[in-house]
């Protein structure tokens, strides 16, 4: 789950991580009120959407007067901001962060990620702050410094200090930088983060080390024990189809292709997308109906897939283990009739009660193409769309 920058800073502040003073505003008038409550002569007006690249896209403004705060707030609120992370449709700005300006001396990057190669949390840092870390990794990978963290003992002070020295934090501020990193790590672990990025981390003219921006992502599987984080959820920033899918315990992620996929099991779902690509097609979604799908869930899955106007055909790929193929077949038939499906539909069933499932499909009288294997199904749906 993603949250807004201002929410991320609220979380970090509780862990002793230094961030600028700032307040959220939903109207231009409220933006001025928030600016008046800050003890600063320079203000930063920042669009709050769940995407990076806001500065380059014009979503961050420096205001030197209250009138400019109002002017920028009116300009940004309601505007669709398009960044390299939003896609071409962009995101509508519905809230702003009004923040105190600060005297920036140097920008850095600090981040915590889960590294699958080492099965550890890794602290990454670079003196190339303010730019995309992927760009730094590609062009000057030697400028990224890393510390692999032992989960038994956590991030150690000496590791944080080594990283601070390695990215050329001024010697007199290494202690503050290390404290910053230790607080960030504690927040990462205790709040079940999957990513914590500070870009930029800045050294200020008055000798402070603070997070000028903050990106925190959280493990959705751990949200049941993070009630305070759940309160930060902003449904306006999420795909309506994904929200609808979550109501039925369906795992759905929208993609850019035209072949809708309905599969049981995340591994099989990813393999299905891969094989569609292999045969020249483009998947329109990842959709895992799980191991306990009912006819109702299958029907809702169809409705969600078909709500995407780009979908030109559907591939149902089911391996019945816990789930029975006849139940899936009944759901497919019911869903096809309910939604009045006119698009090509290819179904591959294998596993428990597969013969009964195929019989239900064959006797339905509906235009359903059966497939004998995953490869056969992928080739058939690609040829039909």
From Swiss-Prot:
It catalyses: succinate + ATP + CoA = succinyl-CoA + ADP + phosphate; GTP + succinate + CoA = succinyl-CoA + GDP + phosphate. It comes from Bacillus velezensis (strain DSM 23117 / BGSC 10A6 / LMG 26770 / FZB42). The keyword Nucleotide-binding applies. Binds 1 Mg(2+) ion per subunit. GO terms for cellular component: cytosol; succinate-CoA ligase complex. InterPro entries: ATP-grasp (IPR011761), ATP-grasp_succ-CoA_synth-type (IPR013650), ATP_grasp_subdomain_1 (IPR013815), Succ-CoA_synthase_bsu_CS (IPR017866), SUCC_ACL_C (IPR005811), Succ_CoA_ligase-like_bsu (IPR005809), Succinyl-CoA_synth-like (IPR016102). Pathway: Carbohydrate metabolism; tricarboxylic acid cycle; succinate from succinyl-CoA (ligase route): step 1/1. Heterotetramer of two alpha and two beta subunits. Residues 9-244 form the ATP-grasp domain. Its EC number is 6.2.1.5. Mg(2+) binds at residues 199, 213. The gene is sucC. One of its GO terms (molecular function) is ATP binding. Substrate binds at residues 264, 321-323. Succinyl-CoA synthetase functions in the citric acid cycle (TCA), coupling the hydrolysis of succinyl-CoA to the synthesis of either ATP or GTP and thus represents the only step of substrate-level phosphorylation in the TCA. The beta subunit provides nucleotide specificity of the enzyme and binds the substrate succinate, while the binding sites for coenzyme A and phosphate are found in the alpha subunit. Keywords: ATP-binding, Ligase, Magnesium, Metal-binding, Nucleotide-binding, Tricarboxylic acid cycle. This is Succinate--CoA ligase [ADP-forming] subunit beta. Belongs to the succinate/malate CoA ligase beta subunit family. Gene3D superfamilies: ATP-grasp fold, A domain (3.30.1490.20), ATP-grasp fold, B domain (3.30.470.20), Succinyl-CoA synthetase domains (3.40.50.261). Its cofactor is Mg(2+). SUPFAM superfamilies: Glutathione synthetase ATP-binding domain-like, Succinyl-CoA synthetase domains. ATP binds at residues 46, 53-55, 99, 102, 107. One of its GO terms (biological process) is succinyl-CoA metabolic process. It comes from the Bacteria.
């Amino acid at each position: 789950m993603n949250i807004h920058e201002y929410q991320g800073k609220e979380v970090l502040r509780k862990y002793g991580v230094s961030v600028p003073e700032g307040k959220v505003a939903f109207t231009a008038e409220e933006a001025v009120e928030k600016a008046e409550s800050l003890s600063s002569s320079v203000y930063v007006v920042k669009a709050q959407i769940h995407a990076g690249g806001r500065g380059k896209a014009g979503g961050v403004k420096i205001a030197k007067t209250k009138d400019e705060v109002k002017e920028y707030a009116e300009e940004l609120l309601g505007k669709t901001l398009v960044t390299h992370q939003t896609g071409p449709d962009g995101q509508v700005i519905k809230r702003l962060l009004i923040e105190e300006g600060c005297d920036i001396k140097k920008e850095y990057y600090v981040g915590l990620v889960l590294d699958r190669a080492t099965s550890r949390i890794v602290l990454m840092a670079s003196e190339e702050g303010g730019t995309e870390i992927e760009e730094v990794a590609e062009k000057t990978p030697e400028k990224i410094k890393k510390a692999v963290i032992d989960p038994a003992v956590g991030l150690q002070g000496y590791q944080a200090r080594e990283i601070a020295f390695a990215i050329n934090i001024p010697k007199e501020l290494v202690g503050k930088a290390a404290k910053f990193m230790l607080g960030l790590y504690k927040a990462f672990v205790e709040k079940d983060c999957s990513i914590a990025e500070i870009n930029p981390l800045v050294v200020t003219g008055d000798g402070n080390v603070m997070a000028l921006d903050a990106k925190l992502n959280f493990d959705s599987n751990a949200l049941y024990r993070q009630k305070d984080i759940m309160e930060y959820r902003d449904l306006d920033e999420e795909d309506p189809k994904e929200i609808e899918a979550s109501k039925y315990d369906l795992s759905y992620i929208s993609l850019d292709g035209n072949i809708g996929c309905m599969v049981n099991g995340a591994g099989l779902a990813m393999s299905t997308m891969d094989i569609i690509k292999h045969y020249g097609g483009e998947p329109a979604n990842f959709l895992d109906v799980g191991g306990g799908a009912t006819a109702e869930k299958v029907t809702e899955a169809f409705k969600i897939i078909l709500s995407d106007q780009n979908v030109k055909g559907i591939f149902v790929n089911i391996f019945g283990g816990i789930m029975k193929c006849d139940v899936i077949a009944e759901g497919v038939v019911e869903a096809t009739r309910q939604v009045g499906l006119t698009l090509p539909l290819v179904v591959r069933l294998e596993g428990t009660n597969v013969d009964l499932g195929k019989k239900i499909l064959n006797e339905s009288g509906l235009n359903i193409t059966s497939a004998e294997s995953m490869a056969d199904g992928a080739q058939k749906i690609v040829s039909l769309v």
